[in-house]
Design a protein with these regions (language model features):
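Low-complexity, disordered linker/stalk regions enriched in Pro/Thr/Ser/Gly
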Residues: 1-217
């Protein structure tokens, strides 16, 4: 049985290009033959590479690989063991942050299109934060649409870090602003106020907004 302390899960991706493989070596083993390639069922042959129970490849190129092992004893060469491993050392590319059309620049929630590319292991997740807030994990949906939480008016910065399935990452940012609602204006008001009379005010404010009045006695 072949194991790998550096690439233990045959279905996972790793950003380590120096895989290590171990196997048990019984006392009667007289020869070991190993090979790594891109085929799942390669026969490494019948020429012994020596007698050893571990091997460390160096600077293996990115991609999906298979490690092949064959052992020999006095009875000849045994069956071939195959072990798959995946390497991806290149970060994602083409991180694009696009501010979606905004009909209302004062709206506290802002939508972005967030996309990235990874040709080897594939994009896994995004870590997104606004300004200096804690980041949240976001998984891309079908339309690549990310919507912020409700934000206060003013300038903001969208910070995005995209990870591939091997843990490599690429960061990007985009500045945007939320416009403040214009303050309501009082156009006319009575110069004298009596406690037993209705107060009538005239003013201007955006449609469908709630205006709260506070009266303060000097």
């Amino acid at each position: 049985q072949v194991t790998s302390p550096s690439h233990p899960d045959p279905t996972a991706w790793y950003n380590n290009s120096n895989p290590i493989f171990n196997w048990e070596l019984a006392s009667d083993i007289t020869g070991v033959n190993i090979l790594a390639d891109h085929s799942p069922s390669t026969n490494p042959g019948t020429v012994s590479d020596g007698r050893f129970s571990t091997y460390n490849y160096k600077e293996v190129k990115d991609g999906s690989w298979y490690f092949h092992l064959r052992l020999r004893n006095a009875g000849g060469w045994g069956d071939i063991t195959h072990f798959s491993f995946n390497i991806d050392t290149i970060p994602p590319t083409d991180l694009k942050l696009i501010l979606m059309d905004r009909l209302d620049l004062t709206a506290p929630e802002v939508a972005f299109t967030v996309t990235a590319t990874d040709t080897a292991s594939g994009v896994d997740r995004y870590e997104i934060s606004i300004d200096n807030s804690s980041s949240t994990v976001w998984f891309d949906n079908v339309d690549h649409r990310f919507v912020t939480s409700r934000l206060k008016p003013g300038p903001h910065t969208l910070l995005v870090k995209v990870y591939d399935k091997a843990g490599n990452n690429l960061a990007g940012s985009m500045d945007f602003s939320i416009v403040s609602l214009p303050a309501p204006k009082i156009i006319d008001y009575p110069r004298e106020i009596a406690t037993d009379k209705t107060i009538t005010l005239r003013g201007e404010a955006l449609a469908e907004t709630l205006v709260i009045l506070r009266f303060k006695h000097p």
